[in-house]
Regions:
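PLD/PLD-like phosphodiesterase catalytic module centered on the HKD motif
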Residues: 1-3, 26-141
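Short hydrophobic beta-strand segments
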Residues: 18-23, 46
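Short hydrophobic alpha-helical module
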Residues: 13-20, 38, 67
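Positively charged, amphipathic N-terminal segments that serve as targeting/anchoring signals
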Residues: 1-18
Length: 141
């Protein structure tokens, strides 16, 4: 019950946002499921190198896009420089917020973890600006 509540609370933060950026090298189908209820018009970018045994595949992404056509989701590479996972909301606006995540998004809800807001947003600005210039992530077949 507690873990599900934490996931619902996180998804609540996704409402009424202009952008949601998720930095996580271990993405999977569950990552997409957490984003399925995002409002229309929100720009969502997953930054990942898609590593690990249960990585996201192109067919899963295609099926997700067909089932949730109003979710504006794209993916970019991280370039192998991230260990931690982050969620950035409303990047570049006065409402910008950033969260450090203890678990990978593909595992969120499976075990107890921490998601902590970091109020030192300015230190992330150049990192996020660099990520936005990275190439598109190509998912395996």
């Amino acid at each position: 019950m507690g873990v599900q509540y934490a996931i619902l609370e996180l998804e609540h933060h996704f409402q009424n946002k202009s952008s949601i950026y998720v930095v996580d090298n271990y993405i999977g189908l569950r990552t997409l499921v957490h984003l399925k209820n995002s409002p229309t018009g929100v720009n969502i970018i997953l930054f990942s190198d898609n590593v690990g045994n249960n990585k996201l595949h192109n067919i899963e992404f295609i099926d997700f896009c067909k089932e949730y056509p109003t979710v504006n989701l794209s993916m970019k590479k991280t370039g192998g420089i991230f260990h931690d996972r982050f969620i950035v909301l409303d990047y570049g606006t006065a409402n910008e917020r950033i969260f450090l995540c203890g678990t990978s998004s593909k595992d969120a809800g499976a075990r107890i973890t921490s998601i902590v807001e970091d109020y030192g947003i300015s230190k992330y600005t150049p990192v996020i600006a660099t990520l936005l210039k990275n190439p598109t992530l190509i998912l395996p077949q």
